[in-house]
Curated annotation (Swiss-Prot):
<dbReference type="GO" id="GO:0045739">
    <property type="term" value="P:positive regulation of DNA repair"/>
</dbReference>
<keyword id="KW-0963">Cytoplasm</keyword>
<keyword id="KW-0498">Mitosis</keyword>
<keyword id="KW-0131">Cell cycle</keyword>
<feature type="region of interest" description="UEV-like 1">
    <location>
        <begin position="31"/>
        <end position="150"/>
    </location>
</feature>
<comment type="similarity">
    <text>Belongs to the BABAM2 family.</text>
</comment>
<keyword id="KW-0677">Repeat</keyword>
<protein>
    <recommendedName>
        <fullName>BRISC and BRCA1-A complex member 2</fullName>
    </recommendedName>
</protein>
<dbReference type="GO" id="GO:0007095">
    <property type="term" value="P:mitotic G2 DNA damage checkpoint signaling"/>
</dbReference>
<dbReference type="GO" id="GO:0006302">
    <property type="term" value="P:double-strand break repair"/>
</dbReference>
<comment type="subunit">
    <text>Component of the ARISC complex, at least composed of UIMC1/RAP80, ABRAXAS1, BRCC3/BRCC36, BABAM2 and BABAM1/NBA1. Component of the BRCA1-A complex, at least composed of BRCA1, BARD1, UIMC1/RAP80, ABRAXAS1, BRCC3/BRCC36, BABAM2 and BABAM1/NBA1. In the BRCA1-A complex, interacts directly with ABRAXAS1, BRCC3/BRCC36 and BABAM1/NBA1. Binds polyubiquitin. Component of the BRISC complex, at least composed of ABRAXAS2, BRCC3/BRCC36, BABAM2 and BABAM1/NBA1.</text>
</comment>
<keyword id="KW-0833">Ubl conjugation pathway</keyword>
<dbReference type="GO" id="GO:0006325">
    <property type="term" value="P:chromatin organization"/>
</dbReference>
<dbReference type="Pfam" id="PF06113">
    <property type="entry name" value="BRE"/>
</dbReference>
<feature type="region of interest" description="UEV-like 2">
    <location>
        <begin position="274"/>
        <end position="364"/>
    </location>
</feature>
<keyword id="KW-0227">DNA damage</keyword>
<dbReference type="GO" id="GO:0006915">
    <property type="term" value="P:apoptotic process"/>
</dbReference>
Length: 383
């Protein structure tokens, strides 16, 4: 049983649908992160006897600007149709939204299982406004946020700072920016399961109000990360000393766009290459990778000598040339007792050639190399 299912079983049956919808549909904020529920309790007197679960209050964790907000949601299991109360825990204690702006709380619909999700969305809208007000006392932070307003990403920016005395900055302030970049060209084969929405978000952590130290970090959705690599493999530009987000965000966007273009071009060139070989050797194709187009195997015959040609396309194709592995159908290697093979990594090749030209040149090389391969293969141990 998952932790979410365990939590739901503890809730009053009439409250459970609200929490179930939160766990299933509660994706909020720039990163579209899932909400999490824990610490289910009951507000009923301890002597009350019930035959059903009576949990009616719980903590909810909301991803926001690289942090996690912790709020407490309080229903009344004796009157489960009433709207819940909220307690904003930790650094959120001073958050005091105007109840008149929380339409889904003031007009609570107990029959709608999405009512709690809608109420949380209202609260998050007011919380974002609250955070914008907090940074107004810090000129550098206000400048950074204001400078993003004219960019495409202005509607997808979260800023988070905790409660601080006026004019002080005791802990980092986070800017979380969803980068407005088209990720749809990334090939679908990279992640087979449903990985959710494709996105790339930039977290910029300001360690002080002057911005003298800023730490950037890039977060990618599963398919995008699988294609481009994680943070250890994908080195985004450093945040320059004295720089600002208005200049830095476009640099990261350009960097990502180049990586995506490289991935897409490589995929298209591999597909073109494999298609050219299938066109020339259609009847000889043993198998090929129809998703990522990284492998191709052919069964070939020359003067009644049969062999298998395995072709592997490297990740940096076409910059790096494919590897040809000739495998005998008759003879075993003297060293390991396996089918004799000859690996060829050097032959006429240019990354500027089309797939058709590569297949044509490869065919000429294969015909030229077969006699040599047959001679060495025959000289090995026979079956």
């Amino acid at each position: 049983m998952s932790s979410g299912q365990s939590v739901l079983k503890q809730l009053h049956p009439l409250i459970r649908p609200y929490a179930e919808t939160v766990l299933r549909k509660g994706n909020v904020g720039v990163c579209m992160g899932n909400l999490r529920i824990s610490d289910v309790k009951s507000g009923r007197p301890t002597l009350t006897q019930t035959k059903e679960p009576c949990g009616d209050r719980f903590k909810i964790y909301i991803p926001f600007a690289g942090d996690s907000l912790k709020w407490e949601v309080i229903f009344d299991s004796c009157q489960p149709s009433n709207p819940p109360d909220f307690i904003f825990l930790g650094e959120n204690g001073n958050f005091d939204p105007d109840i008149e702006k929380l339409e889904n709380l003031t007009h609570w619909d107990p029959k709608n299982p999405e009512s709690l999700v809608l109420a949380i969305e209202d609260l998050m809208r007011e919380y974002r406004c609250y955070q914008k007000q907090l940074i107004e006392g810090y000129s550098r932070l206000q400048f950074e946020y204001s400078s993003l307003q004219g960019m495409e990403a202005c509607d997808d920016v979260e800023v988070h700072m905790g409660n601080r005395l006026p004019g002080t900055l005791d802990s980092p302030v986070n800017f979380l920016i969803r980068l407005p970049i088209d990720l749809s060209p990334i090939p679908q084969y990279l992640v087979k399961d449903d990985p959710g929405e494709d996105l790339a978000v930039l977290l910029a952590k300001f360690h002080n109000s002057e911005g003298s130290r800023v730490t950037p970090q890039l977060f990618l959705s599963p398919k995008v990360e699988h294609a481009l690599g994680d943070n250890t493999a994908l080195r985004i530009p450093r945040f320059p000393t004295g720089g600002c987000l208005m200049d830095y965000v476009p640099q990261v966007q350009d960097f990502l766009q180049k990586q995506i273009d490289h991935i897409v071009e490589g995929y298209q060139r591999r597909r073109e290459y494999v298609a050219a070989f299938i066109s020339r050797f259609g009847g000889s194709v043993l198998e090929y990778d129809a998703e990522s187009f990284t492998k191709l195997s052919l069964v070939l015959e020359w003067n009644e000598f049969f062999f298998v040609l395995h072709i592997e396309l490297p990740s940096r194709f076409p910059q790096d040339m494919p590897v040809f592995t000739f495998q005998s159908c008759y003879h075993l290697s003297k060293t390991n007792g396996e089918p004799y093979v000859s690996v060829q990594k050097s032959y006429p090749y240019s990354p500027r050639w089309t797939g058709e030209e590569m297949a044509h040149r490869a065919k000429l090389f294969i015909l030229d190399f077969i006699p040599q391969f047959k001679k060495v293969s025959v000289s090995s141990n026979k079956l």
